Regions:
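Short, charged, amphipathic alpha-helices and their helix-cap/turn boundaries
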Residues: 21-29, 71, 105-131, 155-177
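Active-site Gly/Thr loop motif
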Residues: 172-189, 222-285
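Non-transmembrane alpha-helical segments in soluble domains
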Residues: 3, 7, 55, 70, ...
Length: 317
């Protein structure tokens, strides 16, 4: 029944769709040449992965959510007198740091990761934004958070941080942070992964295998309840969503009248759509790589099939 409906849906590109319910049973649908084992560019689906990796370092004692960039990065150029001097790791992971201006180096593979982070700081140094007051969806925040993690862990680059996560968890075995390059990976959108790998990650997160209870409660806080939502791609759906640490608190409404952490997701600009529905207790991903700016198309496909998926959740056997 789900197969039939998915086959009838109009899509601009082939996709794979996988969901896992509480008993571990999975339903998978693969359209055309797409497979759950197809490697796709992540776009913003990497945001949740990056945030969880960093939150594990907090849990392991290497970092604190209250840490400021200048506590970890010797070359951090923001003046102590600047309003931006109060930004901390929690602000960075929730995109409320005030770093709204995104320099070109974030997308330049030949640039040094650390020098680009300093370029990010300098590009925003005079903006007078108070950290925590404004939500602005951009790649800047996670680059700074990532460098804090690299320094706190005492390793040369994000690749060592990611490899340690892989070794500790067994997840994302063949995935990489390699866009625009391995030397200057964009933590907010620079992975390659397969749908199967991402679904395994969501499953482990849901089961409490990646974060302890205290870390999970930190992860699930609505970090933008009082922030002004200055730039949000969710507006393309005509909806108001809030933000946590590297993911969205969804709300299918023109105002945020939903309970936070009911349904969380980290969709990407190519239309891939990973989610954890906490009210119905299942995880899933619509894996695809359409044109840039097709975020809404992946979400729309998932919404079309959701009633059938929710019926499947209730089925025995």
């Amino acid at each position: 029944d789900m197969n039939t409906q998915l086959a009838q849906l109009v899509s601009d590109t082939d996709f794979s769709f996988g969901v896992e319910r509480d008993d571990g049973r999975r339903y998978v649908y693969q359209r055309g040449s797409s497979r759950m084992q197809t490697s796709y560019e992540s776009a913003s689906t990497s945001k949740l992965v990056s945030a969880v990796i960093i939150l594990r370092l907090v849990e392991q004692g290497y970092l604190k959510l209250e840490d400021k960039p200048q506590d970890r990065i010797a070359t951090w150029p923001i003046a102590a007198s600047s309003p931006l001097a109060t930004m901390n790791l929690a602000n960075l992971l929730s995109f409320t740091s005030g770093l709204t201006e995104e320099p070109l180096c974030v997308n330049a593979g030949f640039i040094n990761f650390e020098s680009c982070v300093n370029t990010i700081a300098n590009a925003n140094a005079s903006n007078q934004i108070t950290p925590g007051s404004e939500f602005y969806y951009a790649s800047t925040h996670l680059q700074v958070a990532g460098l804090m993690a690299i320094k706190a862990r005492g390793v040369p680059s994000w690749q060592e941080v990611f490899n340690e996560f892989k070794q500790q968890t067994g997840l994302f075995k063949n995935a990489s942070y390699d866009l625009p390059s391995l030397n200057n990976p964009r933590l907010a959108g620079g992975m390659h992964w397969t749908g199967e790998e991402y679904l395994d990650f969501l499953s482990a997160l849901k089961k409490g295998r990646l974060l302890n209870a205290a870390s999970m409660s930190q992860l699930l806080v609505d970090r933008t309840a009082t922030a002004k939502l200055v730039y949000s791609p969710a507006a393309a759906l005509g909806e108001v969503w809030h933000y946590g640490l590297g993911y969205w608190h969804e709300c299918q409404s023109t105002s945020f009248n939903c309970a936070p952490a009911t349904r969380i997701s980290s969709p990407g600009a190519y239309g891939a759509y990973p989610f954890w529905d906490r009210s119905k207790s299942y995880v899933g991903i619509l894996a695809r790589q359409g044109e840039l700016g097709t975020f809404t198309k992946g979400a729309t496909l998932e919404r079309a099939i959701r009633p059938k998926v929710e019926a499947w959740l209730a089925c025995a056997g």
